[in-house]
Amino acid sequence: MLRTRLTNCSLWRPYYTSSLSRVPRAPPDKVLGLSEHFKKVKNVNKIDLTVGIYKDGWGKVTTFPSVAKAQKLIESHLELNKNLSYLPITGSKEFQENVMKFLFKESCPQFGPFYLAHDRISFVQTLSGTGALAVAAKFLALFISRDIWIPDPSWANHKNIFQNNGFENIYRYSYYKDGQIDIDGWIEQLKTFAYNNQQENNKNPPCIILHACCHNPTGLDPTKEQWEKIIDTIYELKMVPIVDMAYQGLESGNLLKDAYLLRLCLNVNKYPNWSNGIFLCQSFAKNMGLYGERVGSLSVITPATANNGKFNPLQQKNSLQQNIDSQLKKIVRGMYSSPPGYGSRVVNVVLSDFKLKQQWFKDVDFMVQRLHHVRQEMFDRLGWPDLVNFAQQHGMFYYTRFSPKQVEILRNNYFVYLTGDGRLSLSGVNDSNVDYLCESLEAVSKMDKLA
């Protein structure tokens, strides 16, 4: 009898389909997927120029001297070294104080202190820049808008982050055209969209992502005059700027100088009527080498007009800022509960120690000088006629403008790995591979882009 029942039960198995079978296969990540593929290749000439991680002249991922010294201090400090408890939802108080001082007093000395003194900044420690963007996206989709403008081209993960956090309409504005920044096309697109929005009586202000410096992937940044024109337009159209500052310091070698866009956005004298806030997404992955520690921050800065121009100096925080604080905490709690501790301790030690901070500034400048050297080495070796903007590009990358087919040929025939959009990570170039790399690029550049 039992055997009969078991036999009958087994008859159902071929007809039962798990609900998990509906799950489709996602495509490999456009950057990290290539890096994984690279590891399986056996060719001795292979070069990985995909991931934006700084490497030294021997191809090794290094620890900044300032970070190494901070780590030793943490190891020698028993209380810091052994503390494995949870951080608060929004991160450690020390991290908040040190990072806000760096961002809004040192990087923005003219206007930042005004916002700090009037408690107009809500701050959250996040899982690097990606986490900052994700928290910002969730907050914006819940309360402000589900429309966003992303540069074309842009970091591949931008679209993914905002799609996954509730954004319904993702538009692309023209950033790059014929080797230059397409300022006119960019502004015209935004104005046309704003006009159509007005005609449709859509009152939700669209968001817009702005790369603070070292635009990824092109490496081309607007001039100060162009930035003023862009911010004038964004504030006039009541858009919500999301400033992605992943590469502070890597444009000029000066951490403070590279915060120009943030200083411009916060200029209360120039923009007294801006109303929809600024979302600053910042990371210490690139400029402190803390890639795996996932340490960054989100700052939501609000103007006086957002609180009907009212400010009570007797209040610790105005009611609007308290509302924003509470919602950010709720989002973080539901997303990852609290941030990791070790990376923030490293940042705290570096930012709070005068000598270590000075060493950090030197570390960043040294890194940028090496990237400049690599850029110049390649510039001298390559004989391309369209290298005009090569020297104008900044940061960790060179944008080759290769077609997807050329990138594929470079990968399959020469074992040189670029991202699919033709972005090349300069820190992967060194004395041992620069000749082979340039020969490979030269050969592929002569091929028909549409071949």
UniProtKB/Swiss-Prot annotation:
Coiled-coil regions, chain positions: none
Please give the subunit comment from the record.
Answer: Homodimer.
Recorded source organism is: Saccharomyces cerevisiae (strain ATCC 204508 / S288c) (Baker's yeast)
Q: Name one Pfam family in it.
A: Aminotran_1_2
What is the protein name for this chain? Aspartate aminotransferase, mitochondrial
Q: Name one GO cellular component term.
A: mitochondrial matrix
UniProt EC number: 2.6.1.1
The compartments listed are: Mitochondrion matrix
Which residues carry the post-translational modification N6-(pyridoxal phosphate)lysine, per the record? Answer: 286
Task: Give the required cofactors.
Answer: pyridoxal 5'-phosphate
Keywords from the UniProt entry: Aminotransferase, Mitochondrion, Pyridoxal phosphate, Transferase, Transit peptide
Catalytic activity entry = L-aspartate + 2-oxoglutarate = oxaloacetate + L-glutamate
* Binding, L-aspartate: 52, 155, 216, 423
InterPro entries the record matches: Aminotransferase_I/II_large (IPR004839), Asp_trans (IPR000796), NHTrfase_class1_PyrdxlP-BS (IPR004838), PyrdxlP-dep_Trfase (IPR015424), PyrdxlP-dep_Trfase_major (IPR015421), PyrdxlP-dep_Trfase_small (IPR015422)
The transmembrane segments are none
The source's domain of life comes to Eukaryota
